[in-house]
UniProtKB/Swiss-Prot annotation:
Keywords: Disulfide bond, Glycoprotein, Immunoglobulin domain, Membrane, Repeat, Signal, Transmembrane, Transmembrane helix. The gene is Skint6. Residues 26-141 form the Ig-like V-type domain. Residues 142-231 form the Ig-like C1-type domain. It comes from the Eukaryota. It is found in: Membrane. Residues 1-24 form the signal peptide. May act by engaging a cell surface molecule on immature T-cells in the embryonic thymus. Residues 25-1086, 1147-1167, 1227-1240 are extracellular. GO terms for cellular component: membrane. This is Selection and upkeep of intraepithelial T-cells protein 6.
């Protein structure tokens, strides 16, 4: 059972690819930083922008520019940084960070920012024709805190102050203000800029005597709105009066009533806003010294404190006065020389002020600060501190105290706990207050948050020693585990722990205590499930939080692992922890390293023998839910690595593997599976195939599964594409062993051969084959295997014609692609050659392949080298005697349409003609093949649609063949025959014949041509000249070439002799002799004999008819005689003389066309007149014969003889001139019927 686990799961892993959904990102938006972005002058600027939705941007154009599109700050295109296109002022000052370009995110970095770098920056993405941009506003700024006020020596009128500050950008706003914050006009202002573009500001103020006692210099940056200021206080003088007031209070001789009046006066001064603050400060110093003095009686002190309290509580008293009052209280409390009764009076006043709702919050804050400083002071005795803490505790727990006051109280407690200057005993007292407040029912709910803040900040603070932190954690732990504490309180206590764990400022040791607390609480059997739920939630949030450091997360994950694997932990707790794992894996916010640890927990739990089967079952169910979830993110790829390692691991038992298979099966069948999950799963499939640890049997099962997937009609096309992508990657990978590739290619072959598989799927598969063969990164051995499969597919009878057509289409595209390696093309062409050489290959397949070859050769986009390779293969096919003659015929039939097309490149035609030459010169080539090739050559030269330049190239090759001594004589004779037939054909273009005669002339002039070849060529010339069917114009052209050859000195004597013999042997032919020797003789001299015979025959026949008619008392009609009998005789004569035919035609119709028109009409008569005349006149005579009733007359006998003669002549003509008769019948028309005027 252990060995079956891998194949079963591999099968399931591949089936999972059925749920893949192809993603396409045709459009996008660009997001980036919010404007404005502030950057310090001279610093470095980073501007980021991101494609939404995230997608690959390597292939896109990424352009950063400021004002003009054509002036880029940075340009990235086609995967390259185009530094030469950058504007000169940004050269070597910018760089593009492309770490996340796969997600569509880039960052522009500008070094040493200057003032000109301010402005709008455009982040521009362009994909093909679609583009988007995001604009970011950048503002360069600089702020300085270095402000100085210089006082010049005073004079009789006043004093001059000078405020100076440097290091600002842009130019800031600068002004003077008085103590009340009101604007004072400056005497003068000035500014300057240094070499770094920073502004240096200077401002003067002249203060007259007794006008202002203080002034402040304010500077504000317009961009950041940041303010900096410095104050200057002029020295005061009125001190004597204050000294007198102090002596009154110290004197025991002054009665209490007077002191009371004085205090009221002081109080009114304190509460008055018109009194100079300096005077108030002096008064307060007097009061403070009296309170602290032991010589002052208790009643006086009470009066003093009462006046202070009323001033503090009075809302009309300004804040500065109150601050001074409270400072005096604070120093009195902290003064060890002050007696306890006085301190107690002070604290009572403080408490009543804190609890008084009419006292403003600012005053209470100052009071609480005084309490805090007193608690923290080591000079304050423990009894005083206890009294202070009682005030705090009673105030916190009191419902009458405002919540804001309690907040400040607790903040003071917090600062005291965190202070290193506070002794441990004081801190323990403070912690007791916190604990009693947490566990107390009388504390209102708002205080819980305040207490949590104290605990949180105290635990996080590095200033708090570990002992106090441990005490705080214990307080929280005991409160959480206490049944008397309500659930809401426990909830916020757990939140405290969570925030402490997430804090980056928290030291590791404290976090260890917190994590141990979580572990003990989760694994505790006495803990209620509600509390555990909150604890688990916090563990989850800490794991998923990006603020928690990795080490803390690792500790939390160890808790989860130990809890899952611990048999004593409740099942419900384990379920909650597994949910945490599931949600964390699925979460986008969780980093990959955390997920990796989570999955290691899963892996160790699955592989662990100590974990019970129930826990494993729950764990695997969660894996199934993750796989089937539509919210899985790319980080989940780690899960598939775990599945893969578990399948390959020998430590995983069979039962666990079976469960893994059971949870994977419904995942494959689920329609809600996310496309990312599908892609990850099929990547895992690829890794399994590529892995050397997976045995061949498992790979075979995986490939079988692939085959079945692609054959199913219900499989989504997008998912098929993803599967095919992986097949392509496997075949392209050099790490995959050849056996795996071989198995995979067999499955591909089976798919293509299967007629039940949809044609679209086959097309997708063939598209991948196409890409693999085009790729230069694919190994030659892989390509050879693939091409072997292609060969067997085309060779197979069971493969559908459409599939073969698609495959051949892909082959054509590969051969046409200039980026494909030439070696790959050579391999492909070898396959083509082998296919065509097989006699068992279906004829339809061969035809399809030959069509593709024709298209490749005709295509202008195919490289010359590729065509050369292809033609070499064709040549070797034609040379092979084993190849079926029908296939060779097909190949040769390609030549004509290629040469015929004007769109085919001339270079391609030249290459093809080179091969024709080689074929005809080859001694190993079968004669039958050569015959068929020569037929093709003949057709090409006869074809008027073939370009003249192409024919010229062909005739060049014929010339070279005839001149070549290595060419067999039989081949040359065949070629000569074709030349003969071309020259004889009347429909062959004259220009073509002229080209051919040029070549004949060159051949006969050449000394390298064999004598035997020349003899054969001369015999052809002789036969042409002696032929009666050959047109005189052709003979003229031929004789013209002979004349040039005989005149040439370069022609051998033997050749000339041969030609002269031909001319002499052709001399008996009257037509040739007369045409060549006496070109200027008139027409009647050339045809005198024919004309004489014709006239004599007409006279004889006319006399006989005249005598016959006289005997029969008939009226003689010359027109009737001409139209019946004479025309018959003329018809016989016309049959033997071409010129006479033309003469009769032109004379009868009274028309003699000039020039070429005459020539064309003569050619027309030559072709069609003979059979037409005889057919027409035979029909006329036959009708006449049937109309004659007197059978005894000579006329009847004459007509009978004429009918027989006409019929015999017509029969002979039909036998020897079948082709002309057929042509005449096809071209029968009115003009031909009217050659002679026939009358009844």
């Amino acid at each position: 059972m252990g060995t079956i686990g891998v194949p079963l799961t591999a099968h399931c892993v591949v089936l999972f690819l059925l749920q893949m959904v192809a993603l396409s990102t045709e459009q996008f938006t660009v997001n980036g930083l919010e404007s404005p972005v502030l950057v310090p002058l001279g610093g470095n600027l980073e501007l980021s922008c991101q494609l939404s939705p995230p997608q690959q941007a390597k292939h896109m154009e990424i352009r950063w520019f400021k004002n003009r599109y054509s002036e880029p700050v940075y340009l990235y295109r086609n995967g390259k940084d185009l530094n030469e296109a950058i504007v000169y002022k940004y050269v070597e000052r910018t760089e593009l960070l492309k770490d996340d370009i796969g997600k569509g995110k880039v960052t522009l970095r500008i070094f040493k920012v200057t003032s000109v770098d301010s402005g709008s920056y455009h982040c521009f993405f362009k994909d093909d024709k679609f583009y988007e941009e995001h604009i970011i506003e950048v503002k360069v700024t600089a702020t300085s805190s270095d402000i100085q006020i210089l006082m010049h020596p005073p004079n009789s009128t006043g004093v001059r102050l000078e405020c100076h500050s440097g290091g600002w950008f842009p130019q800031p706003h600068m002004e003077w203000r008085d103590s009340k914050g009101e604007y004072i006009p400056a005497t003068s202002k000035s500014h300057s800029q240094d070499e770094n573009e920073f502004f240096n500001m200077t401002m003067d103020l002249f203060i007259k005597s007794n006008s202002y006692w203080s002034a402040a210099c304010y500077i504000q940056n317009f961009v950041t709105h940041q303010e900096e200021s410095i104050s200057f206080v002029l020295p005061g003088t009125k001190v004597l009066l204050l000294k007198n007031i102090q002596s009154i209070f110290q004197s025991s001789s002054v009665d209490l009533e007077k002191k009371d009046m004085l205090l009221k006066s002081i109080k009114s001064r304190f509460q008055s806003s018109s009194v100079d603050p300096e005077k108030k400060e002096r008064l307060l110093k007097i009061i403070q010294s009296r309170i602290e003095s032991s010589s002052v009686d208790q009643e006086t002190k009470a009066l003093l404190l009462e006046s202070i309290q009323s001033s503090i509580e009075n809302s009309t008293v300004d804040l500065e006065t109150k601050v001074w009052l409270l400072e005096s209280i604070k120093s009195s409390i902290q003064n060890s020389s002050v007696d306890p009764e006085t301190k107690e009076l002070l604290l009572e006043r403080i408490k009543s002020s804190i609890e008084n709702s009419t006292v403003d919050l600012g005053t209470k804050e100052w009071l609480l600060e005084s309490i805090q400083s007193s608690i923290q002071s080591s000079s304050v005795d423990l009894g005083t501190k206890k009294m202070l803490l009682k005030i705090i505790q009673s105030s916190i727990q009191s419902f009458s105290v405002y919540i804001g006051t309690k907040e400040w109280l607790l903040e003071r407690v917090q600062s005291s706990i965190q202070s290193s200057s506070v002794d441990l005993g004081t801190k323990e007292l403070l912690l007791e207050i916190i604990q009693s407040s947490i566990e107390g029912y009388s504390v209102e709910l708002g205080i819980e948050e305040l207490l949590s803040k104290i605990i949180l900040s105290s635990i996080q603070s590095s200033r708090v020693d570990l002992g106090i932190k441990e005490l705080l954690v214990k307080i929280c732990q005991s409160s959480i585990q206490s049944t008397s504490v309500i659930l809401e309180t426990k909830e916020w206590l757990v939140k405290i722990f969570q925030s402490n764990i997430q804090s980056s400022s928290m030291d590791l040791e404290t976090k260890v205590w917190l994590v141990k607390f979580f572990q003990s609480s989760i694994q505790s059997s006495s803990m209620d499930l509600g509390t555990i739920k909150w604890l688990v939630k916090n563990v989850q949030s800490n794991i998923q939080s990006s603020r928690v450091d990795l080490e803390t997360k690792r500790m939390l994950l160890e808790i989860i692992q130990s809890s899952i694997q611990n048999s004593s932990v409740h099942r419900g707790t384990k379920k909650m922890l597994l949910k945490v794992i599931q949600s964390s894996i699925q979460s986008f916010s969780v980093d990959l390293e955390t997920k990796e640890w989570l999955l290691k927990i899963i892996q160790s739990s699955i592989q662990s023998s100590s974990v019970d089967i129930g826990t494993k079952s729950m764990l695997l169910k969660k894996i199934g839910l993750i796989l089937r979830s539509s919210i899985v993110n790319p980080g989940t790829e780690l899960l598939f690595q775990i599945i893969q390692s578990d399948l390959q691991s020998s430590s995983v038992n069979t039962e666990t593997r079976e469960m893994l298979f059971e949870i994977t099966q419904p995942t494959v069948q689920s329609s809600s599976v996310n496309s990312v999950t599908e892609e990850l799963l099929e990547e895992n499939y690829q890794l399994l195939l590529q892995s050397s640890s997976v045995n061949l049997e498992a790979e075979n099962i995986l490939n079988d599964t692939t085959q079945r997937i692609l054959q199913l009609s219900s499989v989504n096309q997008g998912r098929e594409k993803l599967l095919l992508d992986r097949i392509q990657q496997i075949l392209q990978s050099s790490s995959v062993n050849p056996e795996t590739k071989c198995w995979l290619l067999k499955r591909i072959q089976f798919i293509l051969e299967n007629p039940s598989v949809h044609q679209e799927k086959k097309d997708l598969l063939l598209e991948r084959i196409h890409l693999i063969l085009q790729s230069s990164s694919v190994q030659k051995e892989t390509k050879s295997l693939l091409l072997g499969s292609i060969q067997s597919i085309l060779h197979s009878f069971s493969v559908q014609k459409e599939t073969k057509y698609l495959l051949l289409e892909k082959i054509q595209l590969i051969l046409q692609n200039s980026s494909v390696h030439q070696e790959t093309k050579d391999l492909l062409l070898k396959i083509i050659q082998l296919i065509l050489q097989y006699s068992s290959v279906h004829e339809a397949t061969s035809k399809l392949l030959l069509e593709r070859i024709q298209l490749i050769l005709q295509s202008s986009s195919v490289q010359k080298e590729t065509k050369d390779l292809l033609l070499n293969r064709i040549f070797s096919i034609l040379q092979n005697s084993c190849v079926d003659q029908g296939v060779k015929y097909f190949l040769l039939n390609i030549i004509h349409p290629i040469l015929q097309k004007t769109s085919v490149h001339q270079e391609t035609k030249s290459m093809l003609l080179d091969r024709i030459e080689l074929i005809l010169q080859s001694s190993s080539m079968q004669q039958e093949t050569k015959n068929h090739l020569l037929d093709q050559i003949e057709q090409i030269l006869q074809d008027t649609t073939v370009h003249q330049e192409t024919k010229d190239l062909l005739l060049n090759r014929i010339e070279l063949i005839l001149q070549n001594s290595s060419v067999q004589q039989e081949t040359k004779e065949l070629l000569m025959d074709k030349i003969d037939s071309i020259l004889r054909y009347t429909w062959v273009h004259q220009e073509t014949k002229d080209l051919l005669l040029n070549r004949i002339e060159l051949i006969l002039q050449s000394s390298s041509v064999q004598e035997e070849t020349k003899n054969f060529l001369c015999n052809i010339i002789a036969s042409i000249l002696q032929s009666t069917s050959m047109h005189q114009e052709k003979k003229k052209l031929l004789l013209g070439r002979i004349e040039l050859i005989l005149q040439s000195s370069s022609v051998q004597q033997e050749t000339k002799k041969l030609l002269l013999k031909i001319v002499q042997s052709s001399s008996p032919s009257s037509s040739v002799r007369l045409e060549s020797c006496n070109k200027r003789n008139p027409f009647w001299k050339k045809h005198a004999l024919d004309l004489g015979i014709s006239v004599f025959a007409i006279i004889v026949v006319t006399l006989i008819r005249h005598l016959n008619q006289r005997e029969a008392d008939q009226h003689f009609e010359l027109d009737t005689l001409w139209s019946k009998d004479t025309s018959v005789i003329l018809c016989v004569l016309i049959m033997f003389n071409n010129r006479l035919k033309a003469l009769i035609y032109f004379r009868l119709y009274g028309y003699s066309p000039p020039g070429k028109t005459y020539k064309y009409i003569v050619n027309y008569i030559l072709r069609f007149s003979q059979p037409l005349f005889f057919i027409v006149y035979s029909a006329i005579i036959l009708v006449m014969h049937l109309q004659i009733q007197n059978t005894d007359s000579l006329f009847s006998l004459y007509n009978s003889w004429m009918v027989e003669m006409i019929m015999v002549l017509g029969l002979l003509l039909a036998i020897f001139n079948v082709k002309n008769i057929a042509t005449a019948l096809l071209h029968l028309g009115r003009t031909t019927l009217r050659l002679f005027r026939i009358k009844d």
